Curated annotation (Swiss-Prot):
Gene for this chain: Lad1
Native organism: Mus musculus
Phylogenetic placement of the source organism: Eukaryota, Metazoa, Chordata, Craniata, Vertebrata
UniProt feature, compositional bias: Basic and acidic residues: 134-173, 218-231, 267-279, 495-510
InterPro entries per record: Ladinin_1
Keyword Electron transport appears in the UniProt entry: no
Protein role: Anchoring filament protein which is a component of the basement membrane zone.
Single GO MF annotation: structural molecule activity
Name of this chain's protein: Ladinin-1
Amino acid sequence: MSVSRKDWSALSSLARQRTLEDEEEQERERRRRHRNLSSTTDDESPKLTQNGAQRSVERLPSVEEAEVSKPSPPASKDEDEDFQAILRTRKERRQRRQVVEAVQAPVQERPEAEEERDSLGPEQTSSQPLVPKKKVEALPRRRLSREQRGPWAQDEERLKNRELAEGEKRLPEETVAQQKTLVSEKTPVSEKTPVPAKRLVSEKACPSEKGTATEKASLTEKRHSPEKLVPEKTSVTEKSPVPEKTLVSLKTAAPERRSPPVLEKAIVSEKMQERKLVSEKASIFEKSLVSEAKLTPKKAAVSEQPQTTGGSQATTREPRGRALPDKSPPSSAEQSTPAPPTKASRFPPITLQVKIPSKDEDADTPSPTLLTYSSSLKRSSPRTISFRMSPRKDNSETPLTRSASVRLPASTVKLGEKLERYHTAIQRSESVRSPGSSRTEVLVTPAGVASKRHLFEKELSGQNRTEPTSIRKENLRLSGVVTSRLNLWISKTQDSGDHGSQEVRKEASVTKRAQWGSKPSTSLDAEV
């Protein structure tokens, strides 16, 4: 249990480090944007006098500067003042951070790199070969500082979340656009990989975080030799910055205040459920990737192949996980806790972290319930699994409830379709058999003299109309087809009865008129 607790604490600290790393990346981009704005304002004054500086700026613009030059004209003095205030608070925090780092473990790379970055002038920022060098150095330094700053990272998260919320209200779109360009410039290899590969790498980021951290530590040691820098750069950029891009886009879309606590809640909820599986997987990742960090970059490239195979397994499971999000944590339905899967479904890396070992490590898992559950997961389609496998399982209640929830909508859909087909068939048959309906009327009508009298005696149809309808209404408890036919026949007979009564009334009115006409003529004759 102690080993699993250590693994879980390491995973949670790595998740916190990832959120802090993304926030630090946004800070760095804001600093760079502010530096570019100051460099453009400094370059505007000597443009009139020095033609050489103007040509050099026009000759070597980087992709980031080209994007920054578009939103720079609407930037006003108020925004510059806000940026300067944010930069001041960051400098104070950076000094505090350096003091704590000096107490814990003195890292000399961070102040040196920051001095180099702060000493960059407006002429040097426009040159291209310095820009990728700065970015390559930024990755390991940031990761090292985050690993050593584990215990007091929560206080920094709160302060940074407040400032970032203030800053992102003003310029959210620019940060998203520049984050994408920064990640695309950092990873030339990641441009070859398609978009679903990026998602899968981001979803496998939580279990494989330890290995990437150890590789970054080895990268800082090998950074000083320029020969080894190029293959290590490709191996790290394939693993680390690609999930950063998706995670940054997730966090800029969602409010940043909410993301770290939701991550922690999801991790804590899954800690009670899948502790053994994830501890085994984390130990496997740790062993393989620590040995990988000690070896040459060729083995780093070789070890990416099993990662891609794991990604292909995740592709086979991904549509099923999206169609049925209840199945992603297996034991969560056994404990009947619906709240954790809803929280974990917001973050796809965590849900697939639980799902992948259930298929990969069937032989390693000791618990029999998970074995039966994963064997049922391997079936062809989830709907057929749920109610075919449920009578065989006695210990778990989840497939019964799940089969009920799956069966009801399927059965209602089938009944609705059948009813629609019946109604259409009835309408067609009525439209076809409407001329010959007089035959069926005599056969279907209930027996009785009062009900058949209106067929022969039209004079009494108005009086006897109420009796047959009541008799028919009592006898209408039949099948749907017969009732529909009877209703049609009743409506037709009512129409015919109404026509007959109208004819009787017309005849009566004609006779009355004739009588009135004869009466005044006779009276006139009598008067004469």
